[in-house]
Amino acid sequence: MKKITGLFVSALLLLSSCGSVPVTGRKQVLLVSDSEVLTSSLTQYSEYIKSAPISTNTKGKAMVTRVGQKIAAATEEYLKSNGLASEVKNFAWEFNLVKDNQVNAFCMPGGKIVVYEGLLNICSSDDELAVVVGHEVAHAVAKHSNERISQELLAQYGAQILGQALSDKSERIQKIGNTVYGLGAQYGVTLPSSRKHESEADYM
C-alpha cells in the first residue's frame, strides 16, 4: 500500500506542478514556488555582494549597466507582449561588475546580474557582452534554477520510495538498488537537463 501511495503522490505532484518555458514552450516540472526561489536567491545574492570585491572600473561598470538595462527592457517587453506580464514582477534588476579575473557572468533568479572583470577582456563591445549576459538572463527567464531544485526534490522523493520498496530486501540488494538509482538520476536526469538548459538558453 505504501508503494502505491508513494507513486500516486508522485503522479499528483508532477501533474500539478507543470509549467512551460517562455519562447521554447518546453514543459517543465516546477515544485517550488516563485516566491520561495526568489527569497532564497535574494538571500544568497545579498550575502555574495557583501563579500564580493566590487570593481572600481568606471568604464566597465557603465558598460555592464548599459548592456544590462537594455537586456532587462527587452526581456520585460517580450514577457508583456506574449501574455506573461505577471512574470515581470519577479524581476528587480541589479547590475554589478566584480573585480575578478575569471571569464564569467551570472544572472540569479530575480534579475541579479553579476559580471566578472575577466569577461571584459574577452568582450570588448556592448554587443559581445550582450551575448553572454543575454544567455545568463535566459536561464532566469526559463526558471532553470527552479527546475533544477525540483529535479533534486523529485530525486530525493524517489529515493525514499525506493527505500520503502526495498525495505524487506537484503542489505546488499538495498545498496545495489540505491547505487543504480543514484547513477540513473545523475546520468538520466541531471546531466542531460544541464545540457538541455544550456542549449535552451542559447536558443532564447
Where are these regions (language model features)?
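A Zn2+-metalloprotease active-site environment signal
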Residues: 2-6, 18-204
